[in-house]
Amino acid sequence: MGCMKPNRSIPTATVIPVLIYPDVREAVAWLGAAFGFAERVRIGENHRAQLRVGDGAVILGDVRGDRRPPRPGEATHSVMVRVDDARAHCERARQNGARILTEPTDYEYGERQYSAADPAGHQWMFSETLFDVAPEEWGGESVSSG
């Protein structure tokens, strides 16, 4: 990837999902209340917003042209976010109206995860690390890029 130049107008994360919402301002408020995300940049009244998620980021965009949120019953993507306590996070999301798709579950690869849908239909997975496990211990395979 090389050395990226800093720019205060864009998040520093290497990968930044851009998700489309019918109402960006409403989505910013909801994602903050339900999932704890924090707005870092606002572009226009209802055009775009950049949200801080730990050391990562997500950009919200408005509906225009061929850009739209998923339709009911579609799963076009899922965004994974690492959290400290998946059970507490799930309860916060539930109390703020998130549709919980899967309850917090412990997996053999050392993570406790749950998934939720936001009001626009985007799917989010939240993952808490319980312990460090080598991929080979649960059927995965470490691959060196080189």
State the predicted function of each range.
Residues 19-23:
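Short, surface-exposed ligand-recognition loops at beta-strand->loop->(often short) alpha-helix junctions
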Residues 120:
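C-terminal catalytic core of tyrosine-transesterase DNA break-rejoin enzymes
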